[in-house]
A protein has these predicted regions:
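A residue-level marker of the well-folded mature domains of exported/periplasmic proteins
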Residues: 1-204
Length: 204
């Protein structure tokens, strides 16, 4: 049977690379891979997965937009006897066959400790968060706050939905309210790059 790959978004270079890697491997193995882009819309992802199930796929690879919202559709796939692999983000409450992800809590904790070493304890810091409900957002936020709540002055936490353009806008707004900001922790590279554009030549 075919392999279905439901990806959270193809508007982010990381996930583009992820899907290209899957496509290259599928071609090498002679497997039929169907890639569907949820466009960061949890409801669309649910219908995408239900559609893949109706196409009688044998394997579902899922990269959730929202780790809770995707669960019922993934449970339907499991019930239909489809093997399920989650990638980069988890599916909450569903016993999938394989979960492939990095330790986002530990990664964020280490990054925040490094930031403290650069800007010093008690420095004013902002957090730019990922898409609400994504396990990566929750875990990276947890890792950041494990250190930041003890060692930094977190003056703003706002979401920019893992988007570069939103990261820039959010950062501009934060800087207007907090001109003496010393650091910013972003939940992904794209938002960080947007924040860098907003910061310009300021010493942050």
């Amino acid at each position: 049977g075919s392999i279905g790959f439901s990806v959270s978004t193809l508007n982010n270079p990381f996930f583009v690379t992820l899907s290209e890697g899957a496509e290259a491997k599928a071609e090498e193995e002679g497997a039929d891979l169907i890639v569907v882009d949820a466009g960061d819309d949890a409801a669309k992802q649910t219908s995408d997965i239900e559609d893949l199930i109706s196409r009688n796929i044998s394997v579902l690879i899922v990269n959730p937009v929202d780790s809770d919202a995707v669960a019922p559709a993934v449970q339907d796939a499991v019930a239909a006897g489809i093997k399920v692999i989650s990638v980069d983000r988890v599916v909450n409450g569903v016993d999938v066959d394989c979960a492939i992800a990095s330790d986002n809590v530990e990664g964020a904790r280490m990054a925040t400790e490094y930031m403290v070493s650069l800007i010093g304890e008690g420095a004013k810091t902002a957090e730019i968060q990922g898409t609400s409900g994504a396990s990566a957002t929750i875990d990276r936020g947890e890792g950041f706050h494990l250190v930041a709540d003890e060692q930094l002055d977190v003056v703003s936490s706002q979401t920019a939905n893992f988007s570069r353009s939103e990261g820039m806008t959010v950062m501009e707004n934060i800087l207007q309210a907090q001109p003496d900001l010393k650091g910013v922790f972003a939940h992904n590279d794209e938002m960080a790059l947007g924040a860098v554009e907003a910061i310009g030549n300021r010493d942050i």
